[in-house]
């Protein structure tokens, strides 16, 4: 399988959304950029902020859509077209209600699971054949409480667990960038097994 050329963090722009559960994807690419000493700059034709980094000898783009979560696909598809990147060479990092904080999972293809950034991207692409990094934020217990939950900030313990999951994912990223997704999945899923209970 081809390696990665684009990593997209899904989230909402603006300081009021910083470090909310819904912005776990933004946090992931922010940490990647910080570790690489790269800075995000606004790219208006791509409707988002971009940075270029190198992992495992491969240069790749980071993207944070500035469209708000529900319209993320506009930015993602513009970037794929502009940089001539296949969807299979892209990884979308996003918050995942169905996983506890401290857990991260890699996945290829599948549905959107109610995640609006994925939903919009899949609608515009016409399929879901791209890689996803699902960063667990936990579930509030009832669907009526989901919106305030995702738009709120996690408590100290959950926030630290989300940070650990992001670090775990970054540790296996060189394998994914090189195209060895099976090994990356195996290592990531082993490294944070039972994370929800630590």
Indicate where each model-derived feature is located.
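Nucleotide and nucleotide-moiety/phosphate-recognizing core
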Residues: 1-109, 119-133, 140-145, 152, ...
């Amino acid at each position: 399988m081809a390696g990665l050329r684009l990593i997209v963090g899904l989230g909402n722009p603006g300081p009021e959304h910083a470090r909310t559960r819904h912005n776990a994807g933004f946090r992931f690419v922010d940490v990647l950029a910080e570790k690489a000493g790269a800075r995000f700059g606004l790219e208006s034709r791509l409707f988002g902020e971009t940075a270029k980094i190198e992992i495992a000898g491969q240069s790749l783009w980071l993207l944070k859509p500035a469209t708000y979560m529900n319209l993320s696909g506009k930015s993602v598809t513009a970037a794929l077209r502009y940089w001539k990147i296949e969807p299979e060479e892209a990884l979308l990092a996003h918050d995942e209600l169905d996983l506890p904080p401290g857990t991260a999972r890699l996945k290829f293809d599948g549905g959107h699971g109610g995640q609006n950034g994925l939903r919009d991207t899949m609608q515009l692409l016409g399929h879901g054949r791209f890689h996803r990094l699902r960063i667990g934020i936990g579930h509030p217990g009832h669907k009526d409480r989901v919106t305030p939950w995702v738009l709120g900030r996690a408590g100290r313990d959950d926030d630290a667990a989300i940070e650990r999951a992001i670090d775990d994912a970054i540790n296996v990223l060189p394998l994914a960038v090189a195209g060895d997704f099976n090994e990356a999945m195996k290592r990531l899923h082993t490294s944070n097994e039972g994370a929800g209970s630590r």
